[in-house]
Amino acid sequence: MSVLLVGVSHRTAPVPVLERVAVTDTDRPKLIDKLLASSHISEAMIVSTCNRVEVYAVVDAFHGALTEVGEILADHSGLDLTALHAHAYVRYSEAAVEHLFAVASGLDSMVIGEQQILGQIRSAYASSDAQQAAGRVVHELAQQALRVGKRVHSETGIDSAGASVVSVALDRAAGIIGEGGLVGRTAVVVGAGSMGGLSVAHLTRAGIARIVVVNRTQERAEHLAETARSNGVDADGVAFDQLSAAMAQADVMVTCTGAVGAVVTLADVHRALAEPDRDNTKHLVICDLGLPRDIDPAVAGLPGVTVLDMETLQRDPAAGAAASDADAARTIVAGELATYLAGQRLAEVTPTVTALRQRAADVVEAELMRLDSRLPGLDDPQRDEVARTVRRVVDKLLHAPTVRVKQLASAPGGDSYAAALRELFELSPGSPAAVATPTDLVDGDRTGRDLQA
């Protein structure tokens, strides 16, 4: 079994395509069920963020599984396979593992070094586990990716600037607002999830004077507002029907709800701008960080309003981590990848070694029974001594080659040694004793492949 990755991200697709492929928390369980119902897929995990969707599947056949994943994503997005192919990337085996480690480290993010991806991978893993879609391979892969990401962030300065999509968007907003930036201004945050919490934290550090949190569940909005108040910021949490009134006072608004369809309509913004207490000299900057987008695209055409969405941020990416920090992170990823793959190769050969020792033990027992029939006069002490001697001989004969084959198996191409043992000693590759769910993460090349390969 090998790992197959099919993904679409900010590096390969424009925002309109990402919107169609986007996987919400509601979508994810349904898609995982479809993946597990496929004939070539035994485990699955879906990583979905504001600028990427990646399906990780444990498969028994590359081409068959690639077709199945492609069809499921095409059906979900409404894109035909040709259109999906134009924006998708495929990684297989070692390359899929390497990619996830790089993603967890923040090396593939739009803002290099951002830490939010770790929480998003953790959420994807938890969702997979909750649906019993995570077997041994996904468990080990996800856990190791999280460990690698944490190590990169703790041992390098890749996130020393504390940059994230939220911070980059708010920095741009401050520049548009002009003198003083966000200091003393009023902000609206739409959505009380993790991105909403991150927005409140950044706004607080930027010196914002007032925050209004808008959420469909007012209790959650109030809880997030209390966090802001505890840090000395005037804040309220309101229900969604208060959105226009809240916008009327705002200099900046941040949205990232994960909802399907426009959460903030053109009519909502018109009402806000028409509120009698709206200061018409204010410029409203809206940071739409949702995928799909939360803001009706027509809002961008209104005078006195600037919309910064993921497409805008992609066109003018922020400076990422220092080159030296990114290089240090890549070095860690490369070392961790080598260690992980060596462990997986060793895990593959171990069941074969166990089967070989069991085969030898069975032969010894059969010969001892044959000895009993040929020399019935042996007393128990004599028979025990013969048995110990035969077993010692067998153990000594097997010790060096089995230790050596484990050493050799941990190197690239090591799976061939397990195959050689099975062939030489007639150990059936389908036997549970010979092969106990091997990971086989090094079966295949490291290059990306087309979706229609």
Curated annotation (Swiss-Prot):
Catalytic activity line of the entry? (S)-4-amino-5-oxopentanoate + tRNA(Glu) + NADP(+) = L-glutamyl-tRNA(Glu) + NADPH + H(+)
Residue positions of the active site: 50
Q: Report the SUPFAM superfamilies cross-referenced here.
A: Glutamyl tRNA-reductase catalytic, N-terminal domain, Glutamyl tRNA-reductase dimerization domain, NAD(P)-binding Rossmann-fold domains
Binding-site residues for NADP(+), renumbered to this chain? 191-196
Enzyme type, top EC level: oxidoreductase
Q: Which UniProt keywords apply?
A: NADP, Oxidoreductase, Porphyrin biosynthesis
Alphabetized Pfam families for the sequence: GlutR_dimer, GlutR_N, Shikimate_DH
Q: Name one GO biological process term.
A: protoporphyrinogen IX biosynthetic process from glutamate
Give the start-end ranges of region Disordered.
432-453
The Swiss-Prot or TrEMBL record annotates one GO molecular function as: glutamyl-tRNA reductase activity
Please indicate if the UniProt record lists rRNA processing as a keyword: no
**Which family does the record assign?**
Belongs to the glutamyl-tRNA reductase family.
Function noted in UniProt: Catalyzes the NADPH-dependent reduction of glutamyl-tRNA(Glu) to glutamate 1-semialdehyde (GSA).
User: Partners and quaternary state?
Assistant: Homodimer.
Please give the record's comment on domains: Possesses an unusual extended V-shaped dimeric structure with each monomer consisting of three distinct domains arranged along a curved 'spinal' alpha-helix. The N-terminal catalytic domain specifically recognizes the glutamate moiety of the substrate. The second domain is the NADPH-binding domain, and the third C-terminal domain is responsible for dimerization.
Query: What's the miscellaneous note?
Result: During catalysis, the active site Cys acts as a nucleophile attacking the alpha-carbonyl group of tRNA-bound glutamate with the formation of a thioester intermediate between enzyme and glutamate, and the concomitant release of tRNA(Glu). The thioester intermediate is finally reduced by direct hydride transfer from NADPH, to form the product GSA.
Q: What is this protein called?
A: Glutamyl-tRNA reductase
Gene this chain is encoded by: hemA
